[in-house]
Every structure is written in structure tokens, then in C-alpha cells.
């Protein structure tokens, strides 16, 4: 099993340390790969969205089940989210600060973590923690209560 997290931008050293700690825990269950997309700089928001979306799409492996993190999506419980992790090849997409062109992600599942807004770096930790929690649920580990 392989999980890709394709994200626009980078993590600070402090957030990267925590992120890497979760990856070590998850590697017992699955291989996790963080694919970083460079932020596109422009004063034109539409151009930023277009270029970042295209860069993300180029990095999605063939035959990967794509989960687009979106404000325009359904929210799931941790137990339901865990069921998504039973796919063989998964790619989670985290767009940049302006989002992505969601029409370009045909066939992708859309997931929403909250109606609240979170800092980009914090969301990485929320996603990786839910992936770890999901594997804990699937494997009947005490972590999820």
C-alpha cells in the first residue's frame, strides 16, 4: 500500500518534525510519500490556481485513488475516513492558499475536515494524524478512543 500527500508549499522545520514522527508510526502499515509542489507567485489569483492545479495533476500517480481536501465537500467521521485507507494506492491533495480548480479533479473523492479555516501547515498535521488514527482504527489499536 502507498499513500501520497501532494501539497502546495513547504512545512517549517517544527511542523516537519511532527509530520515525520507520524510518518514513522504509519510506515508500519503503509508507505507515505510527501510530494511538495512549489507555490506559484503571481498577482493573478486565477493564474496561481491554474498553475498549481496543473503541477499537482502532473504528480498524481496513475491508478491512484485521489482524495481532494476541499471546503466544498462532505465531512466524515474518523471511522469512515479509516475505510478510505483500505485502497491500495491513495493520493491526498492539499491545494495552495487559493485552492485548486476542482473541476480538473474528475473522479476524485472530496473530503472536508471542518467548516473552520486552518493554517496550511497545521492542516498537514491534521491530515497525517487522521491517517495514523485511521490505521489505528483498522488495526484495533488503543490510540483511537
UniProtKB/Swiss-Prot annotation:
Q: What's the catalysed reaction? A: pseudouridine(1915) in 23S rRNA + S-adenosyl-L-methionine = N(3)-methylpseudouridine(1915) in 23S rRNA + S-adenosyl-L-homocysteine + H(+)
Q: Which UniProt keywords apply?
A: Cytoplasm, Methyltransferase, rRNA processing, S-adenosyl-L-methionine, Transferase
State where the protein is found. Cytoplasm
Which terms in the GO cellular component ontology are assigned?
Answer: cytoplasm
The record's annotation in InterPro entries points to: Alpha/beta_knot_MTases, RlmH-like, tRNA_m1G_MTases_N
Question: What EC number(s) would the UniProt record show?
Answer: 2.1.1.177
Main localization of the protein? cytoplasm
Q: What class of enzyme is it?
A: transferase
Record flagged with keyword Cytoplasm:
yes
Q: Which GO terms describe its molecular function?
A: rRNA (pseudouridine-N3-)-methyltransferase activity
In terms of superkingdom, the source organism counts as Bacteria
Q: Does the keyword S-adenosyl-L-methionine apply?
A: yes
Q: Where does S-adenosyl-L-methionine bind?
A: 68, 95, 113-118
| Gene3D superfamilies, per the entry | 3.40.1280.10
Pfam families, per this entry?
SPOUT_MTase
Q: How does it assemble?
A: Homodimer.
List, alphabetically, the HAMAP family matched: 23SrRNA_methyltr_H (MF_00658)
Q: What does this protein do?
A: Specifically methylates the pseudouridine at position 1915 (m3Psi1915) in 23S rRNA.
Query: Hey, which family's this protein in?
Result: Belongs to the RNA methyltransferase RlmH family.
What is the name of the protein in this document?
A: Ribosomal RNA large subunit methyltransferase H
Amino acid at each position: 500500500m502507498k499513500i501520497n500527500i501532494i501539497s502546495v508549499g513547504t512545512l517549517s522545520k517544527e511542523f516537519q518534525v511532527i509530520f515525520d514522527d507520524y510518518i514513522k508510526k504509519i510506515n508500519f502499515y503503509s508507505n507515505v510519500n510527501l510530494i511538495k509542489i512549489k507555490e506559484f507567485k503571481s498577482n493573478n489569483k486565477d493564474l496561481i490556481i491554474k498553475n498549481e492545479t496543473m503541477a499537482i495533476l502532473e504528480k498524481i500517480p496513475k491508478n491512484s485513488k485521489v482524495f481532494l481536501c476541499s471546503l466544498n465537500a462532505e465531512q466524515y467521521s474518523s471511522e469512515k475516513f479509516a475505510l478510505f485507507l483500505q485502497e491500495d494506492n491513495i493520493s491526498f491533495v492539499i491545494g495552495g492558499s487559493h485552492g485548486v480548480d476542482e473541476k480538473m479533479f474528475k473522479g476524485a473523492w472530496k473530503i472536508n475536515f471542518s467548516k473552520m479555516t486552518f493554517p496550511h501547515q497545521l492542516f498537514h498535521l491534521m491530515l497525517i494524524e487522521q491517517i495514523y488514527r485511521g490505521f489505528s482504527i483498522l488495526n484495533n489499536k488503543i490510540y483511537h478512543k
